[in-house]
């Protein structure tokens, strides 16, 4: 008597042991074989090739995609995680094709490496000079969010909320300033090969960017966090320049609001950008930040900024510091706070003088 024919294995069956592998599983429950072995091989080859070509952003993107297809208990997961950390470190140091190729940007990187007080001052000037260049060279990415319906709908709701209170010119200016700020996060996330959605705006509160992949380490988190206020500074500067050129106090009001919102976002607490920027600072650097903020408050005659200095001091005492110094983030943090607060104060004075 002939035996019944064995059914052909389905596409979801393990090729090694024949066990059924549910679509949500990353490894066979029977023998532990990787469910996406072929895809992982392709991603690894693409990542290696991208690294050799100097395209570190593409390499990180491929490695992160591979990490998503691996169970965390597999040894390959730890290996790729370390590989991502190494490539990410190179990106943080300004390596790779996506790094700005302007002489100004090269000067900033060289000054950071040399260190010193005078070097930091020069770096501030060079970086301030390149803010508008950043906005222009990243224009394509900045416009990316407008192609996403959820972003557009939330922008309309956000703009309408403030339009009803302050009128459309101020509402539109504030909306665009916040948009540039949030897209700064997205641009740097993509530089690190991290998939992220376009910004979603919440009327009366602000906006946020949904991550589709996790950041690998503190340095990525800090640089992504301060990217918002850095790009936001470009919007703040543009609004203030528009006021100086046209004399229209609406632009001064936009610059003032943009500066204040970005400065508040630099509070080193919770998930605010300042809190993310602080994660790579040692305890000593956090105390330097607190002292620097106090000096800014004194120079600008702004007692309210002393509150921020107090928060920095509290974080220096109570927070968990990094064991690795990060003078770049310390200097950038103080620069952004001074720039946003300074422009906000100047713009507010213009609005107050005009009696608006």
Give the label of every model feature segment:
Residues 18, 32-35:
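Cys/His-coordinated zinc-binding microdomains
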Residues 36, 73-94:
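TPR/TPR-like alpha-solenoid helical repeat scaffolds
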Residues 40, 85-356:
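Hydrophobic transmembrane alpha-helices and their immediate loop junctions
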